[in-house]
Amino acid sequence: MTSAYDKLHSTLDVKAFGRVAVLYGGKSAEREVSLKSGAAVIDALSTAGVDVVAIDVGDDLLARLQSEKIDRAFIILHGRGGEDGSMQGLLECLGIPYTGSGILASALAMDKLRTKQVWQSLGIPTPRHAVLASESDCLQASTELGFPLIVKPAHEGSSIGMAKVNSTQELVAAWQDAAKYDSQVLVEQWIHGPEFTIAVLRGQVLPPIALGTPHVFYDYDAKYIVNDTQYRIPCGLDSVKEQELIDLTARACDAIGIEGWGRLDVMQDEQGRFWLLEVNTAPGMTDHSLVPMAARAAGLDFQQLVLAILAESVATRG
């Protein structure tokens, strides 16, 4: 990765990026995380000499993009309105190149149910699941999937609205809570075993990271607030299993159409089998975030990572 980046860096002219809008903040439930990610990206690009315009996305976005004469956009919005294909569609209508995945891949990845359906159709392992829309759905899922289970809003990130449950009563309560965030709620089989997260950058898979947390799972607090989460790089897998994980990640990304950069979450069960959970097309870039951590393990500092993501928008969208 370092040699590939060195080749990129040797030919990189930051002036070629033009006037770059960093789109961050927004109105989703992940706004606070996006504000932190955006601030870090803005600082890195500014320090590198890029002409940056910071735009906290609101109702005046279209006017700002036009009045600021934006040439390119770095999307660091998390969640709905920025990571679900809608922002990508707006930018394409305006003819503004942008970072990350396109409209379809962004929309697919934001929809946990559709992502799982694509993976299942291609034989890519993902935990069994059910859609919850009523108490009777909860009862049926309890019977068909057993316990423990994990409940998820279908279109939220950062583990917002998620809960592990061990009984039908807990499942009903968790469904009702998740439904406050999303009209569509999923429940999945709980996979017992270690969790891994794998970042991808410019078509390459970065070193996998093993996660350890004293929390029930890698939730919002573990991701962004507390400092008791353990990260292991190298991830502790033997070379054969690590390569299997890398190959599975690449296959899963290709299935969704991930471009530029992203991050996948994977569980390994007690039999050593891997299970894909979900994919993130605009991962966090805070001081707790995993993509910068994986990039460091591959030899890239934060500024190099940000420039590599931005440079990919030139390669793919001009």
UniProtKB/Swiss-Prot annotation:
<dbReference type="GO" id="GO:0046872">
    <property type="term" value="F:metal ion binding"/>
</dbReference>
<dbReference type="GO" id="GO:0008716">
    <property type="term" value="F:D-alanine-D-alanine ligase activity"/>
</dbReference>
<keyword id="KW-0479">Metal-binding</keyword>
<keyword id="KW-0547">Nucleotide-binding</keyword>
<dbReference type="Pfam" id="PF07478">
    <property type="entry name" value="Dala_Dala_lig_C"/>
</dbReference>
<feature type="domain" description="ATP-grasp">
    <location>
        <begin position="116"/>
        <end position="311"/>
    </location>
</feature>
<dbReference type="InterPro" id="IPR005905">
    <property type="entry name" value="D_ala_D_ala"/>
</dbReference>
<feature type="binding site">
    <location>
        <position position="265"/>
    </location>
    <ligand>
        <name>Mg(2+) 1</name>
    </ligand>
</feature>
<keyword id="KW-0464">Manganese</keyword>
<dbReference type="InterPro" id="IPR000291">
    <property type="entry name" value="D-Ala_lig_Van_CS"/>
</dbReference>
<feature type="binding site">
    <location>
        <begin position="142"/>
        <end position="197"/>
    </location>
    <ligand>
        <name>ATP</name>
    </ligand>
</feature>
<dbReference type="Pfam" id="PF01820">
    <property type="entry name" value="Dala_Dala_lig_N"/>
</dbReference>
<dbReference type="GO" id="GO:0005524">
    <property type="term" value="F:ATP binding"/>
</dbReference>
<comment type="function">
    <text>Cell wall formation.</text>
</comment>
<feature type="binding site">
    <location>
        <position position="278"/>
    </location>
    <ligand>
        <name>Mg(2+) 1</name>
    </ligand>
</feature>
<protein>
    <recommendedName>
        <fullName>D-alanine--D-alanine ligase B</fullName>
        <ecNumber>6.3.2.4</ecNumber>
    </recommendedName>
</protein>
<comment type="pathway">
    <text>Cell wall biogenesis; peptidoglycan biosynthesis.</text>
</comment>
<dbReference type="GO" id="GO:0009252">
    <property type="term" value="P:peptidoglycan biosynthetic process"/>
</dbReference>
<keyword id="KW-0133">Cell shape</keyword>
<dbReference type="InterPro" id="IPR013815">
    <property type="entry name" value="ATP_grasp_subdomain_1"/>
</dbReference>
<feature type="binding site">
    <location>
        <position position="280"/>
    </location>
    <ligand>
        <name>Mg(2+) 2</name>
    </ligand>
</feature>
<feature type="binding site">
    <location>
        <position position="278"/>
    </location>
    <ligand>
        <name>Mg(2+) 2</name>
    </ligand>
</feature>
<keyword id="KW-0436">Ligase</keyword>
<dbReference type="GO" id="GO:0005829">
    <property type="term" value="C:cytosol"/>
</dbReference>
<dbReference type="GO" id="GO:0008360">
    <property type="term" value="P:regulation of cell shape"/>
</dbReference>
<keyword id="KW-0067">ATP-binding</keyword>
<dbReference type="InterPro" id="IPR011761">
    <property type="entry name" value="ATP-grasp"/>
</dbReference>
<dbReference type="GO" id="GO:0071555">
    <property type="term" value="P:cell wall organization"/>
</dbReference>
<dbReference type="InterPro" id="IPR011095">
    <property type="entry name" value="Dala_Dala_lig_C"/>
</dbReference>
<keyword id="KW-0961">Cell wall biogenesis/degradation</keyword>
<dbReference type="InterPro" id="IPR016185">
    <property type="entry name" value="PreATP-grasp_dom_sf"/>
</dbReference>
<keyword id="KW-0963">Cytoplasm</keyword>
<keyword id="KW-0573">Peptidoglycan synthesis</keyword>
<keyword id="KW-0460">Magnesium</keyword>
<comment type="similarity">
    <text>Belongs to the D-alanine--D-alanine ligase family.</text>
</comment>
<dbReference type="InterPro" id="IPR011127">
    <property type="entry name" value="Dala_Dala_lig_N"/>
</dbReference>
